[in-house]
């Protein structure tokens, strides 16, 4: 039995290492990712929505190809360079921000500058200059100027891009992205844990070597427990949410027996394991504060999409290879329509907010209560209303949550006591984070005085703990246990509608990121372009039939405002 666990762990570790070395790719990876002839993309060209923000900013491959197109034209290249500089200014540390801002002004706005930006009105340039004269200029000095450039790029340059070979290449990748996904897309590895409807296994994309976690929802178990709405809700929320602080959904597919969610793999284990299994229970305050800051960012991203999570607990907070955390398991999450409140008695005993226990209506207040519980537990080494290893039944736990006040040991600093007590306020109307300023108020608490949230959100801060890359932070295979066979449930054609809604293949942004991070995007583009002259590339471009643009299209063409965030893509080197 120990041999079985050893072999499973060895295979998983080898697979994890393969992604960075490119050895995880199938020998047939070029065949698996073969780009179609441009002529096959005509229907896609006509049907795809010409939305500048989506095609040239939000979609990673689209962003890279649009930037490559801009780099061929000096005036557009200057625009991209300015956007990058403005984005870098926003995440520059406060002590260096003014000096860096002045260098941007000197480079792009002075009359004798070689890279001036005539698109920006003089009054905005003057306003930037005035702001930069202050000893501590605003973080948003260049925001309005960037907005002007975004709008400029979304108009004629965007039209020219759509006539270029770069846009053709984008369509080829979009065609590839829309191919069906099956179990044969992946290699399967050991079981990592259990979910409500089935196992969670490690898996690897054959074409790229990228590792993921595959959450399998058994079809018969879903039907028996009437979990169709819950499963589809989790899938749809994950599909629309793109946050570095919440696990990402990359693929959905189905097998004969299961529906599968392919998610970010978090090799560092969960917070519960780290709180209780590595030394004495609990963390030093610095480590707890870092995780709390990332959780605050994750909750802010969820609330921006009107989503309440409702199940914050250590088991659901996972660490990645570098020690950053992500919120996982969105089975109880719910999207709340604007201006409405919801009622629902869901969550985990000991972490449910008083308003949930009392069947009251709420919006996002339960999640700020949950954050208070987590900060307390990370520091104290036990939850706020239950001592370490104490057994308490549901009724007693709910009584404590509603009536008792948590106690603080000497492990809590004054700031730690303050934020916990403010988040664990029984009355949600008085709880930190539950007023109009929401997450901003939580971020401004003194406990986060050493956290630069702009840099944290840009992934520029180092975590206080880095997991061992040679360790497997999960239970042994035999300790995880197996699900019993579901009996007395038959699947029929009526279930197929639900399966079709669920199993929709690749999710755009994570899939495109995978292609870039794996090096496949770079390698395939170089392979496809090998030996082609610029004239030949132009001929490939012009062979596509383009729809005629009528008067109304020209009159009402979309001029969406782009929200480009500077991101430096690092690609693996060739071996």
UniProtKB/Swiss-Prot annotation:
It holds the Pfam family RGS. Residues 1-153 are annotated as: N-terminal. Its main location: cytoplasm. Signal peptide: none annotated. One of its GO terms (biological process) is signal transduction. GO terms for cellular component: cell cortex; cytoplasm; dendrite; neuronal cell body. CDD domains: STKc_GRK4_like. Residues 449-514 form the AGC-kinase C-terminal domain. Keywords: Acetylation, ATP-binding, Cytoplasm, Kinase, Lipoprotein, Nucleotide-binding, Palmitate, Phosphoprotein, Serine/threonine-protein kinase, Transferase. The gene is Grk4. PROSITE patterns: AGC_KINASE_CTER, PROTEIN_KINASE_ATP, PROTEIN_KINASE_DOM, PROTEIN_KINASE_ST, RGS. Residues 186-448 form the Protein kinase domain. The active site is at 311 (proton acceptor). Interacts with DRD3. Specifically phosphorylates the activated forms of G protein-coupled receptors. Plays an important role in the regulation of renal sodium handling and blood pressure. The modification N-acetylmethionine is found at residue 1. Palmitoylated. It catalyses: [G-protein-coupled receptor] + ATP = [G-protein-coupled receptor]-phosphate + ADP + H(+). It is found in: Cytoplasm; Cytoplasm, Cell cortex. This is G protein-coupled receptor kinase 4. Its EC number is 2.7.11.16. The modification Phosphoserine is found at residue 484. ATP binds at residues 192-200, 215. The lineage of its organism: Eukaryota, Metazoa, Chordata, Craniata, Vertebrata. It comes from the Eukaryota.
């Amino acid at each position: 039995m120990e041999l079985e666990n050893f072999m499973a762990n060895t295979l998983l570790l080898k697979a994890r290492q393969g992604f960075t070395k490119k050895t995880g790719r199938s020998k047939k990876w070029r065949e698996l990712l073969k780009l179609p002839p441009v002529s096959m993309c005509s229907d896609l060209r006509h049907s795809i929505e010409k939305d500048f923000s989506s095609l040239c900013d939000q979609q990673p491959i689209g962003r890279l190809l649009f930037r490559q197109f801009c780099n061929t034209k000096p005036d557009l290249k200057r625009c991209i360079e300015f956007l990058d500089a403005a984005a870098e200014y926003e995440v520059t540390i406060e002590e260096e921000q003014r000096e860096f801002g002045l260098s941007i002004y000197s480079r792009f706005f002075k009359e004798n500058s070689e890279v001036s930006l005539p698109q920006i009105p003089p009054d905005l340039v003057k306003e930037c200059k005035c702001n930069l004269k202050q000893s501590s200029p605003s973080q948003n000095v260049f925001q309005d100027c960037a907005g002007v450039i975004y709008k400029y790029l979304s108009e004629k340059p965007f039209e020219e891009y759509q006539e270029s070979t770069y846009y053709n290449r984008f369509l080829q990748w979009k065609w590839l992205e829309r191919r069906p996904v099956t179990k044969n897309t992946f290699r399967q590895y050991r079981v990592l844990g259990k979910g409500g409807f089935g196992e969670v296994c490690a898996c690897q994309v054959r074409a790229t070597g990228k590792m993921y976690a595959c959450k399998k929802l058994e079809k018969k178990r879903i039907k028996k427990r009437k979990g169709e709405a819950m499963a589809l809700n989790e899938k749809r929320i994950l599909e629309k949410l793109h946050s570095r602080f919440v696990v990402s959904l990359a693929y959905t597919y189905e097998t004969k027996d299961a529906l599968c969610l392919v998610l970010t793999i978090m090799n560092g284990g969960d917070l519960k394991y780290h709180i209780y299994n590595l030394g004495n229970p609990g963390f030093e305050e610095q480590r707890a504060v870092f995780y709390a800051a990332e959780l605050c960012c994750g909750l802010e991203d969820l609330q921006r999409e009107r989503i309440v999570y409702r199940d914050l607990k250590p088991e659901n907070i996972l660490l990645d290879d570098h020690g950053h955390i992500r919120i996982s398991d969105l089975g109880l999450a719910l999207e709340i329509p604007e201006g409405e409140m919801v009622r629902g008695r869901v969550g985990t005993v000991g972490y449910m907010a008083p308003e949930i226990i009392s069947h009251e209506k709420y919006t996002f207040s339960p999640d700020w209560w949950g954050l208070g519980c987590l900060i307390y537990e990370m520091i104290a080494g036990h939850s706020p209303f239950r001592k370490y290893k104490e057994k308490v039944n549901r009724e007693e736990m709910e009584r404590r949550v509603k009536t008792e006040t948590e106690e603080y040991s000497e492990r809590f600093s004054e700031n730690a006591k303050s934020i916990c007590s403010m988040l664990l306020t029984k009355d949600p109307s008085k709880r930190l984070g539950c007023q109009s300023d929401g997450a901003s108020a939580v971020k401004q608490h003194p406990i986060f005085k050493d956290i630069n949230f702009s840099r944290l959100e840009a992934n520029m801060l180092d975590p206080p703990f880095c997991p061992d890359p040679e360790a497997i932070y999960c239970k042994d295979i035999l300790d995880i246990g197996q699900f019993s066979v579901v009996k007395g449930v038959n699947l029929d054609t009526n279930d197929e509608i639900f399966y079709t809604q669920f199993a929709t293949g690749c999710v755009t942004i994570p899939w495109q990121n995978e292609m870039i991070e794996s090096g496949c995007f770079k390698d395939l583009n170089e392979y496809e372009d090998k030996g082609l002259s610029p004239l030949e590339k132009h001929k490939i471009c012009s062979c596509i039939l383009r729809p005629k643009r009528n008067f109304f299209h020209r009159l009402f063409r979309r001029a969406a405002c782009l929200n480009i965030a500077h991101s430096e893509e690092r690609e693996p080197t060739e071996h």
